[in-house]
Amino acid sequence: MTQSSNQTKDRVQRLGKVAVLMGGVAAERDVSLRSGAEVLKALKSEGVDAVGCDVTSVAQLVEIAQKYDRAFIALHGRWGEDGGVQAVLDSLALPYTGSGMTASALAMDKLRTKWLWKGVGLPTPAFIVVSPSRPLDVETFDLTFPVIVKPSHEGSSIGMRKVDTLDALQEAVDFAQQYDSEILIEQWITGREFTCAVLDGEALPMIQLKTDHDFYDFDAKYQSNTTEYLCPCGLEIAEEKRIQALVLQAFDAVGARHWGRVDLMLDDQNQPWLIEINTVPGMTDHSLVPMAAKAVDLSFSKLVLKLISLTLP
């Protein structure tokens, strides 16, 4: 047995029993179950003693902390990705993958993430906020159409719509408010769409997304077979490195750790615009972080093993 395989075997033993947390109570429950199933299969293929856990309550987390040595969080959306689960696991002293409570809560909040990025001088599209205390006022609306309307606290593009006219704006806001009381109306950026994964402090190769939809929506992410993923992304090496450095700044500003993904646009003048950050990216067969990892010869199972290993002291 080689030294490398000995080290892997030792690491697997040190991991102990791993709970893969999936499902949850958010609108992204089905996606989470798919991510969790893939993660569980990968961990088992690497010899890890892992069990899938469909969690929907704090009581379940308390029970899990008594039975397992660490957790792989494959929960997407509210509670699982917004700091709720992370806070409980912190209180139970159970190590887990991904960002801590504060960074998770911030990253899940698109509005406050944008305020933070703007405050530290990072580029993000202009926006306005609609909430119960700030109703939409078409008389003072000063963004240029088109715009994109999105719930502040949802993922997977749930509740999002592109709007081309003032007449259609209220309908899009009403639709988004089915998912969240706080709505973001953001300036539409015409250009190319990219995503950049971050793994253990390093930016992975960027991916350019091409879709025949208006934007990279839920269907384009999880169901469409026409979405194109370009990796290499088509940028010059120096340009990609420049944007990767920006991505790391955005990731660090939020206080994220272990892994994540930053989505951005590159406009017609090659100006990058930060859109959002995901601290528990999808891990399905359509997902982007595994695709970027593959570009640096990191298989899905090795990626998952690396992530859970980041919970070791």
From Swiss-Prot:
Domain ATP-grasp: 114-309
The protein's Enzyme Commission number: 6.3.2.4
Cofactor: binding comment: Binds 2 magnesium or manganese ions per subunit.
Keyword annotations from UniProtKB, A to Z: ATP-binding, Cell shape, Cell wall biogenesis/degradation, Cytoplasm, Ligase, Magnesium, Manganese, Metal-binding, Nucleotide-binding, Peptidoglycan synthesis
Single GO BP term: cell wall organization
Cellular localization per UniProt: Cytoplasm
GO cellular component: cytosol
Function (record text): Cell wall formation.
Protein name: D-alanine--D-alanine ligase
Natural source organism: Hydrogenovibrio crunogenus (strain DSM 25203 / XCL-2) (Thiomicrospira crunogena)
